[in-house]
Amino acid sequence: MPIGVPKVPFRSPGEEDASWVDVYNRLYRERLLFLGQGINSEISNQLIGLMVYLSIEDETKELYLFINSPGGWVIPGIAIYDTMQFVRPDVHTVCMGLAASMGSFILVGGEITKRLAFPHARVMMHQPASGYYEAQTGEFVLEAEELLKLRETLTRVYVQRTGKPLWVVSEDMEKDVFMSATEAQAYGIVDLVAVE
């Protein structure tokens, strides 16, 4: 039997009585954001909206994005990454569990020196994939060209944010590369590994 999202008390500044809000709403008010599912347009828009709203509310308080995601759609993932670069507060990224595919791309997009992985977290990077294998030839060629552009974008970002040479990142993106937290730190995807 599912229990749903737990409710916790929250007292707004200036109010005497606390109201009950879901735990994520309460955590958002503390600037703690969660990416705990596959990336699609809906979750991307929710996170973007929260980051922009919290940035407008107070541009001096940093944001924390906790990631446990198998990855997902490329364009919505890039939109999250771009928003992280756009908002004024620094965005800390924290990998707990798994940051795979676009999840690792978002993880590497945190403020440099403020990217963290839990000790048993896993990170996986690879090139973008397409789901259009039954398309007409003309559509497939256009899709392949777009995929190459996206791959170039992702590769460039990994190179800039990890400090790895282009040839290393390009070669690694040819396949699924899984890393432990310490391996992700050595690669430059995260800066710190939390202690056990």
UniProtKB/Swiss-Prot annotation:
One of its GO terms (molecular function) is ATPase binding. The active site is at S101 (nucleophile), H126. Gene3D superfamilies: 2-enoyl-CoA Hydratase, Chain A, domain 1. It is an enzyme of class 3 (hydrolase). Its EC number is 3.4.21.92. One of its GO terms (cellular component) is endopeptidase Clp complex. Keywords: Chloroplast, Hydrolase, Plastid, Protease, Serine protease. One of its GO terms (biological process) is protein quality control for misfolded or incompletely synthesized proteins. The keyword S-adenosyl-L-methionine does not apply. InterPro entries: ClpP (IPR001907), ClpP/crotonase-like_dom_sf (IPR029045), ClpP/TepA (IPR023562), ClpP_His_AS (IPR033135), ClpP_Ser_AS (IPR018215). It is found in: Plastid, Chloroplast stroma. It catalyses: Hydrolysis of proteins to small peptides in the presence of ATP and magnesium. alpha-casein is the usual test substrate. In the absence of ATP, only oligopeptides shorter than five residues are hydrolyzed (such as succinyl-Leu-Tyr-|-NHMec, and Leu-Tyr-Leu-|-Tyr-Trp, in which cleavage of the -Tyr-|-Leu- and -Tyr-|-Trp bonds also occurs). Pfam families: CLP_protease. Cleaves peptides in various proteins in a process that requires ATP hydrolysis. Has a chymotrypsin-like activity. Plays a major role in the degradation of misfolded proteins. Component of the chloroplastic Clp protease core complex. Belongs to the peptidase S14 family. This is ATP-dependent Clp protease proteolytic subunit.
